[in-house]
């Protein structure tokens, strides 16, 4: 029999301080120690695991490396890059995009000047200063914007397909600006050794604190489910059943080694997978859907086509295939 532990009755929201970018959430009562246990897990997931949008790189006409200066612009390229890292976006776009700006001086280049060509995103901190352009200068800049999680260094934003002069930028995807955890004592009846967990969540405005808390909780729950469903009891199989399992294992292993070029796919999907270095069914099913949508020129039409192909083999995206020990 499992001892019945004290659980929170609900999550309270401090309405007096609640805004579109700040929320205080209170969970009580909790068993002693669980305020820190749950609070730290929520804090880490909020800060590092929520998806967001950020600039991944730029290309400025006439500039070929990141340590350059630009004629007619007060700031040098490293300073412009530092300012661009601070730009915050609200976006429903699931893949990367590019926007091109032509700026003629005299002008203060602000974050609000970064406009989506097809409405893919919206800049939140429009008044952020990027650069100062004098009266005789004209600057053309390509800005590359992507989706991701947490923090991605500039090195990982570089790829062979980028144009000459592309300058990769550290991407700060996380939409969470700060999370503060406070644990206090609370009472249940005559007992005073329970805990109250308080989470102060501040976002950049691209996601509400309520949605951030809900998404973080779902991410944690999805991981904990693996442990909750774990059973240490090993099933006993007959020799015939073991042989059947071995045959099924080898059959699946052979299927996962199937080359992408052997599948009945459109030329567009073939090219997208080739550029992403996805060569086999095993490579494909080990990817998540959101990963594929981040690849260049890979859209929902290609994703739907691939899902239909996988369904023919009773496969799906996001599979764990490590036990099949496929060669890279």
From Swiss-Prot:
Task: Please list the GO terms describing molecular function.
Answer: DNA binding; DNA-directed RNA polymerase activity; protein dimerization activity
Spell out the Gene3D superfamilies in the cross-references.
Answer: 5' to 3' exonuclease, C-terminal subdomain, DNA-directed RNA polymerase, insert domain, RNA polymerase, RBP11-like subunit
SUPFAM superfamilies found in the cross-reference section: C-terminal domain of RNA polymerase alpha subunit (SSF47789), Insert subdomain of RNA polymerase alpha subunit (SSF56553), RBP11-like subunits of RNA polymerase (SSF55257)
The Gene Ontology biological process annotation of the record reads: DNA-templated transcription
Q: Which Pfam families match?
A: RNA_pol_A_bac (PF01000), RNA_pol_A_CTD (PF03118), RNA_pol_L (PF01193)
What is one GO cellular-component annotation here? DNA-directed RNA polymerase complex
- Superkingdom assignment: Bacteria
EC number(s): the record gives: 2.7.7.6
Q: What are the boundaries of the region Alpha N-terminal domain (alpha-NTD)?
A: 1-231
Transmembrane domains' residue ranges: none
Region Alpha C-terminal domain (alpha-CTD), as annotated, extends over 247-328
Q: Which UniProt keywords apply?
A: DNA-directed RNA polymerase, Nucleotidyltransferase, Transcription, Transferase
Describe its partners and assembly state: Homodimer. The RNAP catalytic core consists of 2 alpha, 1 beta, 1 beta' and 1 omega subunit. When a sigma factor is associated with the core the holoenzyme is formed, which can initiate transcription.
- UniProt comment concerning the protein's domains: The N-terminal domain is essential for RNAP assembly and basal transcription, whereas the C-terminal domain is involved in interaction with transcriptional regulators and with upstream promoter elements.
Annotated function = DNA-dependent RNA polymerase catalyzes the transcription of DNA into RNA using the four ribonucleoside triphosphates as substrates.
> How is this protein named in the record?
DNA-directed RNA polymerase subunit alpha
Specify the species.
Chlorobaculum tepidum (strain ATCC 49652 / DSM 12025 / NBRC 103806 / TLS) (Chlorobium tepidum)
Q: Which gene encodes it?
A: rpoA
């Amino acid at each position: 029999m499992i001892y019945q532990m004290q659980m929170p009755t609900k999550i309270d929201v401090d309405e007096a301080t609640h805004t579109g970018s700040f929320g205080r959430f209170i969970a009580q009562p909790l068993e002693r120690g669980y305020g820190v246990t749950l609070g730290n897990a929520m804090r880490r997931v909020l800060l590092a695991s929520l998806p967001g949008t950020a600039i991944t790189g730029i290309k400025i006409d006439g500039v070929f490396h990141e340590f350059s200066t630009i004629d007619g612009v007060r700031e040098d390229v490293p300073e412009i890059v530092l300012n661009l890292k601070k730009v915050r976006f609200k976006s429903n776009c699931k893949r990367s995009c590019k926007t091109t700006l032509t700026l003629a001086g005299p002008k203060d280049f602000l974050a609000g000047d970064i406009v989506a060509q097809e409405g893919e995103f919206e800049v939140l901190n429009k008044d952020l200063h990027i650069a100062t352009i004098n009266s005789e200068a004209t600057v053309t800049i390509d800005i590359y914007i992507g989706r991701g999680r947490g923090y991605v260094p500039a090195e990982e934003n570089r790829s062979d397909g980028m144009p000459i002069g592309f300058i990769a930028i550290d991407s700060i995807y996380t939409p969470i600006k700060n999370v503060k955890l406070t644990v206090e004592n609370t009472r249940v009846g005559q007992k005073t050794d329970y805990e109250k967990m308080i989470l102060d969540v501040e976002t950049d405005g691209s996601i509400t604190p309520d949605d951030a808390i809900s998404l973080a909780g779902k991410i944690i729950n999805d991981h904990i489910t693996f442990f909750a469903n774990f059973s240490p009891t090993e099933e006993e199989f007959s020799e015939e059943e073991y042989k059947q399992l071995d045959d099924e294992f080898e059959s699946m292993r052979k299927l996962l080694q199937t080359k992408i070029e052997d599948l009945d796919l459109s030329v567009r999907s073939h090219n997208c997978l080739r550029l992403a270095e996805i060569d086999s069914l095993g490579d494909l099913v080990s990817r998540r859907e959101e990963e594929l949508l981040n690849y260049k020129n890979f859209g929902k039409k290609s994703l739907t086509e691939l899902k239909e192909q996988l369904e023919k083999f009773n496969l799906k995206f996001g599979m764990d295939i490590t036990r099949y020990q496929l060669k890279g």
